[in-house]
Amino acid sequence: HQFPPLIYQVASAGIEPSSISFPFRKLFHGRKDFYFRMAEVRSVFTDQKILQTSIGKISYDYLVFAAGTTTNFFGNKNVEEHAIPMKNVSEAMGLRNALLENFERALTCSSETERQELLNVVIVGGGATGVEVAGALSEMKNHVLPKDYPDMPSSLMNIYLIEAGP
């Protein structure tokens, strides 16, 4: 299990994934008559309190659905093709790695145009997560880059936050 409100901190190297991730089963250690099964639900028979799942039939007393979430690109194929979503720790680590790789490449590239492209970060979505990511990257730009990359001016990094609202 993970704590989604802090996933942006993982992406910006503010915290480690273990700070917001923990085994779901540990929440219920020592609980009697509690069983956790992760499966794909195929049918729900509420009158019989039975689920038909990818691992067979499961009876229940109380049923809690934790359906998760997916990134909505609102039909924007360009964003869908080029963006790095950030709904879970794995995606946040992918974003973190992409950022750090770009910083490393920017240090050694010979073209100023390429360097600027590597240091331009575009955040699509001005909701809570987008704003938090922009703020965390600003902190990274002002405090981490000068220490970890002293031979690369942090002023070269640009952060753009794009919102498609009305």
Task: Show which residues each predicted segment covers.
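FAD-binding core/adjacent interface of flavoenzyme oxidoreductases
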Residues: 34-122, 140, 145
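Beta1-alpha1 glycine-rich phosphate/pyrophosphate-binding loop at the start
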Residues: 1-34, 121, 128-166
